[in-house]
A protein has these predicted regions:
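Sec-dependent signal peptide recognition
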Residues: 2-9
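Terminal connector regions
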Residues: 95-137, 199-234
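Intrinsically disordered, low-complexity Pro/Gly/Ser/Thr-rich segments with frequent PxxP/GP/PP motifs
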Residues: 62-98, 172-201
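Intrinsically disordered, low-complexity segments enriched in serine, threonine, and glycine
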Residues: 144-234
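Short acidic, flexible loop segments centered on an aromatic residue
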Residues: 45-67, 155-173
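Buried hydrophobic-core signal for structured, non-transmembrane domains
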Residues: 37-43, 85, 90-92, 106-111, ...
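Beta-sheet-dominated interaction scaffolds and their linkers
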Residues: 19-45, 79, 133-144, 182
Length: 234
């Protein structure tokens, strides 16, 4: 059954008014060599929903998400007008048929015509979605004295979607840090997330999370043991 777009990475405006949309799927995939994929919209509310589809190239830096308008992905239609109860299919396809050498990440944004309504953002990835390839995300805890951060590195060629992030202490006690969607680490990128304070500073334990295929994995440490303070020069 459809999931509210709140299950996407973020809902750009707070609150979920009556004019919300159902979106399916909430993660989109295009093959490396082209092809197309479809996004279905459903307006279950009593009001008409009008807006447009925007395509944004998605890049990540250590502490920031970078979104820029892109013409590499085409949407059809781009203008949306859904009466109450109506459904609409949006086709998404690459402008070029040349295969991409590395996974490309985008955000598909549904921007309403009324500023009082929420904008929705869904991830789209173009590249080989090999089910046998598991993202190899590495984790390190960093502390600057006032804040503690979890630094994640994804050296692989496939993005990592992390759900249910938890920490398991040396004694085996598990603490849930983020029960739902924790976030994404794009292929070849690093991200840093703030952690809640902990008396032992996360010393000696390990982090667990579920990947996009539903498997729970241990996030490998960059060093033989996860240290609170990173070595000099990192």
């Amino acid at each position: 059954m459809p999931m509210r777009a709140l299950l996407a990475l973020f809902l750009l405006l707070p609150g979920l008014p009556a004019a919300a949309l159902d979106l399916l799927p909430t993660t989109l995939q295009l093959p490396a060599e082209g092809g197309r994929t479809e996004l279905w919209l459903h307006n279950p509310g009593p009001e008409r929903w009008q807006g447009e589809v925007q395509i944004l190239a998605w890049e990540q830096q250590l502490d920031a998400e970078r979104l820029q308008p892109s013409d590499r992905i085409l949407a059809s239609p781009t203008r949306l007008d859904l009466a109450p109860g109506a459904r609409q299919r949006v086709w998404l396809l690459p402008r070029s048929a040349v295969p991409v050498a590395a996974e490309q990440a985008y955000r598909i944004v549904l921007a309403p015509g009324r500023s009082s309504l929420p904008r929705y953002s869904l991830p789209l990835f173009q590249g080989a979605a090999a089910p046998s390839v598991r993202p190899a995300v590495r984790a390190r805890v960093e502390s600057n004295g006032s804040q503690t951060h979890l630094r994640l590195d994804n050296p692989g060629r496939l993005h990592a979607r992390l759900d249910g992030l938890s920490f398991e202490s040396v004694g085996g006690h598990r603490s849930v840090l983020l029960p739902g969607l924790a976030g994404y680490v794009l292929a070849g990128r690093e991200r840093r997330w703030t952690l809640p304070a902990r008396r032992d500073g996360y010393l000696g334990g390990r982090f667990r999370a579920r990947l996009q295929d539903g498997r729970e994995v241990v996030l490998d440490a960059w060093d033989p043991s996860i240290a609170v303070n990173p070595p000099a020069g990192l």
